Amino acid sequence: MKTIPTATESIAEFFSRYTGYLTTGDIEGLASAYNYPSLAVTALGCLAITDPQQSRDFFTQGQDFYRSCGIQGVRARDITTDIEVPGIWLGRLVLENLDDNGAPAGLERNAYQVVTAEDGTRRIAVSTPLDAYPQP
């Protein structure tokens, strides 16, 4: 039986690293923050992400879009752990978008399932945007 790896970073440290990659536009860093395969889940369907190039393409396009909207950075807020067991974290958080001056420029709520890789780093296995739907 395989041993469950121990995380080398807290979930707050992981999301700090992840939002750092988003802020600096570090496409390779972003691709490395995901498990392969991983899953993007929305009410419109599920997308299996089986190759890091899919992540690179997605985040390159996303960087162009966010920069064109004046968003220059992002930070994680309100990290909520719904459950954590060895090797798996399940929870949600708010990504706060920042303008050129570091002022808040919008919020995006997301849910994640994060796994611990064999080397102890955390990686996103499932991501779900929670604000991509009309509110009732």
Predicted features and spans:
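A short hydrophobic beta-strand element
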Residues: 73, 85-95
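Short beta-strand edge/turn micro-motifs at domain boundaries
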Residues: 91, 104-136
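Hydrophobic/aromatic beta-strand elements that line small-molecule binding cavities or substrate pockets
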Residues: 76-81, 94-97, 109-116
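Acidic surface patches and DE-rich sequence motifs
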Residues: 42, 99, 117
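Short, low-complexity N-terminal intrinsically disordered segments enriched in polar/charged residues
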Residues: 1-36, 40-42, 136
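A solvent-exposed, acidic/Ser-Thr-rich amphipathic alpha-helical stretch
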Residues: 27-79
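Short, cysteine-centered beta-strand-loop-beta hairpins and adjacent loop/turn segments enriched
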Residues: 97-105
